[in-house]
């Protein structure tokens, strides 16, 4: 990836290939930062242990799945004292009173290992931010997304927590990414707030799509930059999206 970015003409002052004051850049070397963030969330009562598998969540009655986004969690392991989300009552059907009390009693306050840990979202709260490209955004917790995983049972931080911790530690002030991650931004804003961190600005790019309107993605066997490069594309053609032989 780094080689492909250089080929495209993109440069940077600091990174894995150059070093710099914000090293290390490999997440396996930054574990201490993630564990510290997990402890702060745990002490604040902002997260809870969960034993549900991905299959459990996907098969939960009425659990919606918005394309590439994860299904909204039914709340089976949610603490009983938390407020039942009103936006999607069907998710609670047959699950009332069935929270996993054993997970809460077995989980260690000093280590996240052995459980999925979910962030307890404020149901009904609108997460508002102004995107630098798409303008004002309003995403509702508990309706557009549910309690999400911040630490996985295989003892590694989940994407949402890792990127928040890394961006804050590295002094990132602007985040540029695809428009398919708007809901992830809402989740991450909640984490920034819970951890008392400065929230960066966001710019969500339009997605690159094929002739059928499907976004280009590895899971769909879409061509990679390396394949385009090997196929005779120039950096200018890749940046403009105009293939060789066309003007």
Predicted regions and their residues:
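Active-site cores that bind ATP or allylic diphosphates and position pyrophosphate for catalysis
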Residues: 54-90, 94, 105, 110-217, ...
